[in-house]
Amino acid sequence: KYISPINEPNGEWSQNPNQEGSFATKADIYKVVYELDKAITNASIPTKIIIPEIGNMKYLFEADSIPKMPDNLIEDLFTRQGEYCVTKFKNLYQCIAAHDYWTTYPPKLLVEMRTKIRNAIKNIPLIKFWASEYCILEQNEEITMPPSPTRSINLGLYVARIIHHDLTIANASAW
């Protein structure tokens, strides 16, 4: 039903052969969606395209020091003012997909980032937000401790807090 052709376009994947991802500029993302939309239409396949599957939610808004790094993706891909607006493609599922990595701690950052997402998409007609990938990669005092039943409970509560905030603050329609 869905296809996600680009994974974590903000990552410089040539530096780590043990990870998968597909670095892509906003122009690359637009071209992929354009070509895939055309192919899906021509083949009459009942499939929707999901993008951008960004690996860090900050790139939905912020710029980075790397010039080609895709940033400000909500405005540039999902609003009519955006140079690479993809909302016109009929096979695009109208959602912004993002991964939760590196935006979960401290709790203040968790809340701030999800509030930014909610505020950014509330005035874009029909656009939803999906929290589309997460596993614990961070190391912080809430979850870093020797293996024990307490650690297992803390890890579960940590992930539950992320899910809760994605659903209730960012209004994620999928997790």
Annotate each language-model stretch with its function:
Residues K1-E8, E12-Q15:
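Mobile, glycine-rich extracellular loop/lid and propeptide segments
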Residues Q19-W175:
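Substrate-binding and catalytic surfaces of secreted/luminal carbohydrate-active proteins
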